[in-house]
Regions:
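Charge-rich, well-structured scaffold segments of protease-associated domains
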Residues: 18, 76-228, 296-428
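M16/MPP (pitrilysin/insulinase) zinc-metallopeptidase core fold and M16-derived inactive scaffolds
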Residues: 38-102, 167-171, 283-299
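Beta-strand elements of well-folded, non-transmembrane domains
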Residues: 42-46, 262-264, 322-324
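Mature N-terminal segment immediately following signal peptide/propeptide cleavage
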Residues: 7-40
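Short strand-connecting beta-turns/loops that link adjacent beta-strands
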Residues: 30-34, 195, 251-252
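Short, surface-exposed beta-strand/loop micro-motifs that present aromatic residues
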Residues: 15-16, 24-30, 187-192, 240-248, ...
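His/Glu-based metal-binding/catalytic segments typifying zinc-dependent metallopeptidases
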Residues: 41, 228-288, 396
């Protein structure tokens, strides 16, 4: 690895190719022999579900995309994967849907051709659609039996008014219940978003760039560009603190979510990076609050802060699971006091440097296989369509000062931007 590359957060040599139809290809040769990881990222997630009554369709298509084509019906698709010893799966997020497969390099052309067919020629009947829509309802009901899933759903519904981040990737229950009746709309959704200009192909592993480029051009080059652009509703400014409570119908430990409207993803501005560092400095296992609440006082058995990357402004959230319902208010006040301390004074420089070093080291350790490299790139290309955004983001981390963290806390972690949600079960 060249010395210059070794200093980058994402140190791998890669090729980025844009095809005339809008498709982007990112090829990352690695030193892991014989294995290839293929990620196909579609920049359509629950954020794109802009029509009232139509939430949940991005996630539904994570299911529908495995229902086959005329050339590769489901049983043939599975047989090809089995013969190749391939592992295939998918996931849906707010901002994108990703389909991923890992296999031996000798099967690359076979898998790439089959994937090109399902992205361009997906075919399913209304009966098949209804069956899959009902399966999604079953998945929602299963998730709804989990307290943290319900807490998360209520938090988003309470915090957001207009933006599509108001609903989770599963969608609103009433929309999921109506989903079996939306066959024609499903065809429209696929036609809008499963287009080359929304799609990035990531290939990482034992490959040659020229051969990958040739095969992608062969099987994906004729895919026709679309024209649809969603109008994502803008979230109005929050005018004051919000609260909600989720009564849980059975015994469970109480949960607490303390959230604030934060910034959108940026690999140039400092605020998002500063809040990422604050989340770790204030709430990781090495933090004073974690040591106090979890280790010494043992009032909490789970404490974490997160500042997820999203295309649009999202939520900085502190999550806590509390052992005794009588301590919920105490834990809430301790969390708020910790956040207030970041607004009032800069984080100690030594603490900030330790956090930066830990995050950089942890990221480097995570890039330990072709699959993990492709998976990481997939998360970031959904935001900026290039792996270079990783290097830019970590350059921003390196420039963050204690005063930058304090300024971001003062700007975003304020009462007027706050939403608190609690969940408490019935008494044992």
């Amino acid at each position: 690895m060249p010395a210059a590359a070794a200093t980058k957060a994402f140190p791998f040599d890669y090729e980025q190719v844009d095809f005339p139809n809008g498709l982007r290809l990112i090829t990352i040769p690695t030193d892991y022999p014989n294995v290839v990881a293929l990620y196909i990222v579609v920049q359509a997630g629950s954020r794109n579900e802009v029509e009232p009554g139509k939430s949940g369709f991005a996630h539904l298509f994570e299911h529908m995309m495995f229902r086959g084509t005329k050339e590769y019906p489901p049983e043939k698709y599975e047989a090809v994967l089995k013969a190749a010893g391939a592992a295939s799966n998918a996931y849906t997020t707010d901002d994108h849907t990703a389909y991923h497969t890992t296999f031996s390099k000798e099967d690359f052309e076979t898998i790439l051709r089959m994937e090109a067919d399902r992205f361009q020629n997906l075919h399913y009947s209304e009966d098949v659609f209804r069956t899959e829509a009902l399966a999604v309802l079953g998945e929602y009901n299963k998730n709804a039996a989990n307290p943290i899933s319900k807490l998360y759903e209520v938090l988003r519904d309470t915090a957001f008014d207009r933006h599509t981040y108001k609903h989770t990737t599963m969608g609103f229950l009433k929309d999921i219940q109506d989903m079996p009746n939306q066959y024609r709309y499903s065809l429209e959704f696929f036609d809008r978003y499963y287009r080359p200009e929304y799609t990035t192909i990531i290939v990482a592993g034992d490959v040659h760039k020229e051969e990958v480029r040739r095969l992608v051009e062969k099987y994906w080059g004729a895919w026709k560009r679309g024209s649809y652009r969603p109008q994502i509703p803008e979230e109005p400014p929050q005018k004051g603190p919000r609260e909600a409570h989720v009564p849980w119908p059975s015994p469970t430990l109480p949960w607490l979510a303390v959230a604030f409207k934060g910034p959108a993803y940026s690999d140039t501005e400092k605020d998002l990076a500063a809040l990422d560092l604050l989340a770790f400095a204030g709430f990781a296992e090495s933090s004073e609050l974690y040591q106090k609440l979890v280790i010494r006082e043992q009032k909490v058995d789970y404490l974490e802060a997160e500042n997820p990357d999203r295309l649009d402004p999202y939520l900085f959230t502190v999550w806590a699971r509390i052992k005794n319902v009588a301590d919920v208010n105490y834990v809430r006040d301790q969390i708020l006091a910790t956040l207030d301390s970041f607004r009032k004074a800069p984080v100690p420089p030594s603490r900030l440097e330790a956090v930066k070093n830990h995050l950089r080291y942890r990221f480097a350790l995570s890039l330990d296989s072709s699959e993990s490299i492709a998976a990481t790139v997939a998360r970031y290309v959904a935001l900026r369509r290039t792996p270079e955004t990783i290097n830019r983001l970590y350059d921003v981390y390196a420039r963050i000062t204690p005063e930058d963290v304090q300024a971001a806390a003062a700007r975003y972690l304020t009462e007027s931007r706050r939403t608190i949600v609690t969940l408490k079960g019935t008494e044992r």
